[in-house]
From Swiss-Prot:
It comes from Neisseria gonorrhoeae (strain NCCP11945). The keyword Membrane does not apply. GO terms for molecular function: ATP binding; metal ion binding; nucleoside diphosphate kinase activity. Keywords: ATP-binding, Cytoplasm, Kinase, Magnesium, Metal-binding, Nucleotide metabolism, Nucleotide-binding, Phosphoprotein, Transferase. This is Nucleoside diphosphate kinase. HAMAP family: NDP_kinase (MF_00451). ATP binds at K11, F59, R87, T93, R104, N114.
Length: 141
């Protein structure tokens, strides 16, 4: 199995519900190590750039507004098949379709207020990690 890194963002709704620790416990209990983390208030420019892949989609403006509406917790997760494992832990984008016990089933409100973001591929994970973290901020353990 491949050791990978992925990005996880705990979105403003989940930060506001004070469930960061509960989400971190799920990562750790499932073999993912947090090797970098920061709390950040995203600027409009940062949110627009980070989600630029969606700029032509109808939900883009609302997503950018939501992601700048409060602080987020951004972390780099490391472990075997980290990208897939994190996506399994997150659950479906729509919390009504998310499997019981997933982060979104337990903490998300709707398809647009859905608690967490996670990279969808190893390639995108590398780009997303580099967007928020320098190599010196990542501490393998």
């Amino acid at each position: 199995m491949a050791i990978e890194r992925t990005i996880s963002i705990i979105k403003p709704d989940a930060v506001g519900k004070n469930v960061i620790g509960k989400i971190y416990s799920r990562f750790e209990e499932n073999g993912l190590k947090i090797v970098a983390a920061k709390m950040k208030q995203l600027t409009l420019k940062e949110a627009q750039e980070f989600y630029a892949v969606h700029k032509d989609r109808p939900f883009y403006a609302g997503l950018v507004e939501f992601m700048t509406g409060g602080p987020v917790m951004i972390q780099v997760l490391e472990g075997e098949n980290a990208v897939l494992k994190n996506r399994e832990l997150m659950g479906a984008t729509n919390p009504t379709e998310a499997a019981e016990g997933t982060i979104r089933a337990d903490f998300a409100t709707s398809v647009s207020i859905n608690a967490v973001h996670g990279s969808d591929s190893v390639e995108n994970a590398a780009l997303e990690i580099a967007y928020f973290f320098s190599q010196t901020e990542i501490c393998p353990r």
